[in-house]
């Protein structure tokens, strides 16, 4: 959520009881700078201190019980500075022995006939509880927290502040702030939502699980509604300035180019080309996402579009996330276009006189198509008349980077490409009203990759399988999650150790190493050797995840595969299976969690990237699917795009109705409109 000005406070943080200069420093580390921030600093979870019936309590379970003290507490000391306090409670006519280790100070706080609440582990056989916390009723004189805290909020904190302190300070702030409603009475009544006052007070100090659910539902809807208001308003602004030059491409020339391709387009590719061409002919700027599974042929579709721009007298640009991918795209496009187009490559490695000449040719129109990394968005990169901007693996760039590239031309058409199929849930959130073309069909002759799962102890067997492929003249990838060994992850294989091991097995000259710490020149040299079949086995981190294309590679081993998400595993797997030869992917993993086992099982069951993306989103959540910063998604405090998908659709419909009807711009919504405009509209989530 944004910095809040719909919550007004009569004082600053320093004026709150218990907050001094040192506490301010700690709060600032938690991104709490104002009383408003404090009020919106929501708990990460809740401790359930609800008192239960002992007759229903399971043995060795954590329980909360309430009873009357009927023996005075006794403390016994043992060892060095260790103690054991024993006291007996009567709990609904059941005599319970309570034991507290290393809390001797409780002896002065617990009195005969006093009613107390104890939280701890229950031993049904011995009828005793090993307590870790004790609460006193609200009428008592003790300083500990009250027993009426059934659902206790737990906050993310840092050294220098305690849970009780932040709870007390939030309670104090809530008593004094003025909270303006973010939703209209009409919306709240329509969807049976609570007031923001009730919602915030309940999220911080819930009186019941039912209240907490109602508060969570209201706040989640509010977050989604404000986000969708921003998206709908931005869409309105973009469409109002979306005038574009109609690209009058040479249809006969384009058809001739397609006929000269060394392969036949799939029906899905043809459909995508037609959809894009219709956009190019339209008087408004194209804003389209081209998504396709790994190896589905998105680059060819992009190439046809670039060629069409050339026939109409316009330049095109393609921005990709890595230098390796940029070089590979440039190489493949040069081969496709031949002498018909002047293709240039601009990355961070292009410097000095070479860069100067390239920029001059770009500005005078000599270059038809520019391929590059984020170097394309630098201020001195000036196009002559760019008509199409393509961003490959667009979620790896921030919102601002994509916008800067788009602004290289006054009326530029925009095409986003991704080999990570976007789940529908994220598509409507991140991409709003963007048109989507999908390529779900693989080129003719491609065989599905056979994926198997092996445990670590089966490594030698997998090695024999890989050796068998190498003897056929094929090549192989071996993927590891780490570059170097880690003391925190001792059981995880690292790429350097595995590289050295495979060198001993196959010979030094046959094995190459690729990872993110190598320089661009070193990476290029290794990839060139692998592409030219000067090395048989490439040991790598996930730096090869996207776009690398070596058709002769037919075997992939992914070590410690359970440390990757489904989408990453699928992208890695897509480096093989790029020819008419049968390819194999072996996942080596001994997962210790149910989630890890589930991921391995799913990978062996399907090669459909669209299905995998949905499953990955369900398992990991939207924040981890792309990474919040890369995706353009805000970091919602309560809302969850998977669990609250239906709510997201409702919020989107309501926001769209308000914006499109113009009602949002009337006086009734002045307060909310100013809030969205000042806090959200021009805010980037990069």
Swiss-Prot record:
**Keywords tagged on the record:** ATP-binding, DNA damage, DNA recombination, DNA repair, DNA-binding, Helicase, Hydrolase, Isomerase, Nucleotide-binding
Q: What is its EC number?
A: 5.6.2.4
Against SUPFAM superfamilies, the record matches this protein to: Nucleic acid-binding proteins (SSF50249), P-loop containing nucleoside triphosphate hydrolases (SSF52540)
What InterPro entries has UniProt attached to this entry?
A: ATP-dep_DNA_helicase_RecG, DEAD/DEAH_box_helicase_dom, Helicase_ATP-bd, Helicase_C-like, NA-bd_OB-fold, P-loop_NTPase, RecG/Mfd, RecG_dom3_C
Return one GO MF term: ATP hydrolysis activity
Superkingdom assignment: Bacteria
Residues of the Helicase ATP-binding domain? 279-439
> Which reaction equations make up its catalytic activity?
Couples ATP hydrolysis with the unwinding of duplex DNA by translocating in the 3'-5' direction; ATP + H2O = ADP + phosphate + H(+)
**PROSITE patterns, A to Z:** HELICASE_ATP_BIND_1, HELICASE_CTER
Q: Which residue range or ranges hold the Helicase C-terminal domain?
A: 462-618
The answer to whether keyword DNA repair applies is yes
| Binding-site residues for ATP, renumbered to this chain | 292-299
Q: Does the keyword Ribosomal protein apply?
A: no
**What are the cysteine partners in each disulfide bond?**
none
Which sequence ranges are marked TM in the entry? none
Region Wedge domain: start-end pairs: 50-149
Q: Name one Pfam family in it.
A: Helicase_C
GO BP: any one term: DNA recombination
Q: Let me see what the UniProt entry remarks about domains.
A: The wedge domain within the N-terminus inserts into the replication fork junction, where the lagging and leading strand split.
Subunit info here reads: Monomer.
Main role?
Plays a critical role in recombination and DNA repair. Helps process Holliday junction intermediates to mature products by catalyzing branch migration. Has replication fork regression activity, unwinds stalled or blocked replication forks to make a HJ that can be resolved. Has a DNA unwinding activity characteristic of a DNA helicase with 3'-5' polarity.
PANTHER family assigned to the protein according to its UniProt record, in alphabetical order: ATP-DEPENDENT DNA HELICASE HOMOLOG RECG, CHLOROPLASTIC
Q: Which family does it belong to?
A: Belongs to the helicase family. RecG subfamily.
Q: What is this protein called?
A: ATP-dependent DNA helicase RecG
**Species this protein is from:** Staphylococcus aureus (strain MSSA476)
Lineage runs: Bacteria, Bacillati, Bacillota, Bacilli, Bacillales
């Amino acid at each position: 959520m944004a910095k809040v000005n719909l919550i007004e406070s009569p004082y600053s943080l320093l004026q709150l009881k218990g907050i001094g200069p040192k506490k301010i420093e700690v709060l600032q580390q938690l991104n709490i700078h104002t009383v408003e921030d404090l009020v919106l600093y929501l708990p990460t979870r809740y401790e359930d201190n609800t008192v239960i019936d002992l007759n229903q309590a399971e043995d060795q379970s954590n329980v909360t019980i309430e009873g009357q003290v009927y023996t005075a507490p006794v403390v016994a000391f043992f060892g060095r500075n260790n103690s054991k306090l024993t006291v007996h409670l009567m709990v609904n006519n059941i005599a319970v022995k309570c034991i507290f280790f290393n809390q001797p100070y409780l002896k002065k706080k617990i009195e005969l006939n006093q009613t107390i609440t104890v939280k701890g582990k229950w031993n049904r056989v011995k009828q005793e509880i090993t307590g870790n916390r004790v609460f006193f009723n609200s009428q008592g004189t003790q300083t500990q927290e009250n027993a009426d805290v059934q659902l206790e909020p737990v906050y993310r904190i840092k050294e220098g502040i305690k849970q009780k302190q932040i709870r007390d300070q939030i309670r104090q702030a809530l008593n004094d702030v003025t909270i303006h409603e973010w939703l209209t009475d009409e919306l709240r009544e329509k969807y049976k939502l609570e007031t923001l006052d009730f919602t915030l007070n309940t999220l911080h100090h819930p009186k019941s699980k039912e209240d907490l659910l109602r508060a969570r539902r209201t706040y989640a809807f509010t977050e989604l509604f404000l986000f969708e208001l921003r998206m709908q308003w931005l869409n309105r602004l973009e469409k109002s300035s979306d005038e574009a030059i109609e690209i009058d491409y040479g249809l006969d020339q384009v058809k001739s180019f397609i006929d000269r391709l060394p392969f036949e387009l799939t029906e899905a590719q043809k459909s995508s080309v037609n959809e894009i061409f219709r956009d190019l002919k339209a008087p408004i700027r194209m804003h389209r996402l081209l998504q396709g599974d790994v190896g589905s042929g998105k680059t060819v579709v992009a190439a046809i579009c670039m060629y069409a721009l050339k026939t109409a007298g316009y330049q095109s640009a393609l921005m990709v996330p890595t230098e390796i991918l940029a070089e590979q795209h440039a190489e493949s496009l040069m081969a496709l276009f031949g002498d018909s187009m002047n293709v240039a490559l601009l990355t961070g490695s292009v410097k000095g006189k070479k860069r100067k000449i390239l920029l001059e040719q770009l500005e005078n129109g000599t270059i038809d198509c520019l391929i590059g990394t984020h170097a394309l968005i630098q201020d001195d990169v000036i196009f002559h008349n760019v008509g199409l901007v393509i961003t490959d693996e667009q979620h790896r760039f921030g919102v601002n980077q994509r916008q800067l590239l788009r602004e290289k031309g006054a009326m530029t058409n925009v095409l986003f490409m991704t080999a990570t199929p976007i789940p529908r849930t994220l598509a409507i959130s991140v991409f709003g009203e963007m048109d989507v073309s999908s390529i779900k069909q693989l080129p003719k002759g491609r065989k599905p990759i056979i994926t198997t799962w092996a445990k670590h102890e089966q490594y030698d067997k997998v090695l024999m399988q890989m050796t068998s492929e190498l003897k056929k003249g094929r090549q192989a990838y071996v993927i590891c999650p780490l570059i170097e060994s880690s003391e925190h992850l001792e059981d995880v294989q690292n790429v350097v150790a595995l590289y050295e091991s495979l060198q001993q097995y196959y010979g030094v000259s046959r094995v190459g190493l690729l990872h993110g710490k190598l320089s661009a020149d070193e990476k290029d040299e290794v990839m060139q050797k692998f592409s030219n079949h000067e090395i048989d086995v490439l040991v790598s981190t996930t730096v090869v995840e996207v776009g690398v294309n070596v058709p002769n590679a037919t075997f992939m081993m992914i070590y410690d595969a359970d440390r990757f998400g489904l989408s990453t595993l699928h992208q890695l797997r897509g480096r093989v299976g790029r020819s008419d030869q049968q390819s194999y992917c072996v996942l080596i993993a001994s997962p210790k969690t149910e989630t890890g086992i589930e991921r391995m099982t799913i990978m062996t069951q399907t090669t459909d990237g669209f299905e995998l993306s949905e499953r990955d989103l369900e398992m990991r959540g939207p924040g981890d699917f792309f990474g919040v910063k890369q995706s353009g998604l805000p970091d919602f405090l309560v809302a969850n795009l998977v669990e609250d998908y239906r709510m997201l659709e409702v919020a989107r419909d309501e926001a769209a109705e308000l914006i499109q009807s113009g009602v949002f711009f009337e006086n009734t919504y002045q307060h909310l409109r100013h809030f969205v405009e000042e806090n959200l509209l021009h805010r980037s989530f990069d």
